Amino acid sequence: MATTVKPRGAEREEGATKGHLTILDHRTNKEYEVPIENGVISAMALREIKIDDDDFGLMSYDPAYKNTASTRSTITFIDGERGILQHRGYPIEQLAEKSRFLEVAYLIIFGELPTQQQLDEWVHGITHHTFLHENLKSLMESFRYDAHPMGMFVSSVAALSTFYPEARDVTDPATRLYQITRLIAKVPTIAAYSFRHSKGLPYVYPNNDLSYTGNFLSMMYKMSEAKYEPNRVLERALDVLFILHADHEQNCSTSTMRSIGSSQADPYSSLAGAAAALSGPLHGGANAAVLKMLNEIGDKKLV
């Protein structure tokens, strides 16, 4: 197991992140002290700054959450300028070298790397939920031949809520964990089916004898061969790519999912909303534009 490290900047003196902010309201000549905790002030503290008792109080205006945190999180630390990325305090270099994606997924969800027994149980639980209900498969087959894969993906993830109505009980920890397991297992299947549909290819059922990423490659690219053997270099590269993208702080899709989930909507509906946000050209859609450009180039000799 890796060794926990403090995020860059955690060694700063306590006085640099705690204390108070003094605000002088020139409208009333009143002075206010706003507590600072970990370099953050509460936006609700501004509500106390009023002209009189009937005043609503000050509000902060921050389009696009450019300087607003909606939650306290210990999942990911990023310092882009210094090239630092950590999940739960573990350097990304260490995780990419020594761990697999499902191990990192466990780390992100539970806060610690799993023991071998915990990892085996975790992988087994996910592996045996990779198949989709045949009715959901039929739903995906009903889309137009030229349907955009992201549109199919969003709709199919949302449809999962109709297959697992118990997911609405979001207050039960065991139920929540069950849906997490299902989503990690079924999202690659839905993604692969959406891709194959866009290519006019038949869907490939999951192969649970393969690794998480090996199975995904099989569902994406298996053709007429009796047994698909994933390219080991590509399989490992994809696993590392999944690790790098395992969490990206409070981005657009994360904020969308948290907003939907705050109403206690089921996890499938929440994730479908997040995926819809991801499809936008200013978010994950930018990756699609890059892939389109690479396909148009066609060969490295043309670069």
Language model regions located:
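Hydrophobic alpha-helical bundle cores within soluble ligand-binding/oligomerization subdomains
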Residues: T3-V303
